[in-house]
Amino acid sequence: MLFSEQLKKEAKPIINQIYHDPFIQGMLHGNLPTEATKFYLRADASYLNEFANIYALLIPKMGNLNDVRFLVEQIQFIVDGEVEAHEILADYVQESYNEIVQEKVWPPSGDHYIKHMYFNAYAKENAAYTIAAMAPCPYVYQFIAQEALRDKELNKDSILAKWFEFYSTEMDELVIVFDNLMDKLTKHCSEKEKNEIKQCFLQSTVHERNFFNMSFNEESWSYGGMKNE
């Protein structure tokens, strides 16, 4: 079994939990609360900006020009392409996407996730650590989207079905490239290093779950019992 396949196998129980948590189930049935949807859009706008920055940190660690070119294309996709998925959610709540994201949020779970990725990008020389921190994001979206399209419970009359359709294919190339890079970059790693990389991947998968739950619950910072508004 390839190392990338092993990572996905071990992450599957977490991804199954994500699928059955309230946020994705709300999308599946077409009844995701409006405020949870808007909170997700605001949080994800901040997250994707940082995700693009982490791609930029990953580029100098790449020794292959084709890999560099692909990462540059992914930055462009984050800037332009992924907005299409966000527009679907904005249409669902019948508000302008640009107006929704004018209000900024930086919740605890999103903060922890982003710092987890930055830590691995800065502290670890081997790019496998950075990729392990980043790869669960596209893989989780691909998996839950494809699972939803197979699910008889999917509300096909809801515009949210288009969100699943978008992610069911848009992540395919990125997942393949990340898998190939992961297998190549860990080929000569020690078992200790591979275990660290695996933990990094699984932690990011947990962060993905926390991000969806954070959005559903409209999570905020609490200082001494007082919420920071």
Curated annotation (Swiss-Prot):
This is Aminopyrimidine aminohydrolase. The active site is at 137 (nucleophile), 208 (proton donor). Keywords: Hydrolase, Thiamine biosynthesis. Homotetramer. It is an enzyme of class 3 (hydrolase). Pathway: Cofactor biosynthesis; thiamine diphosphate biosynthesis. GO terms for molecular function: thiaminase activity. It comes from the Bacteria. The keyword Hydrolase applies. It comes from Staphylococcus saprophyticus subsp. saprophyticus (strain ATCC 15305 / DSM 20229 / NCIMB 8711 / NCTC 7292 / S-41). Pfam families: TENA_THI-4 (PF03070). GO terms for biological process: thiamine biosynthetic process; thiamine diphosphate biosynthetic process. Catalyzes an amino-pyrimidine hydrolysis reaction at the C5' of the pyrimidine moiety of thiamine compounds, a reaction that is part of a thiamine salvage pathway. Thus, catalyzes the conversion of 4-amino-5-aminomethyl-2-methylpyrimidine to 4-amino-5-hydroxymethyl-2-methylpyrimidine (HMP). Is also able to catalyze the hydrolytic cleavage of thiamine; however, this thiaminase activity may not be physiologically relevant. Therefore, is probably involved in the regeneration of the thiamine pyrimidine from thiamine degraded products present in the environment, rather than in thiamine degradation. The record marks 47 as: Increases nucleophilicity of active site Cys.
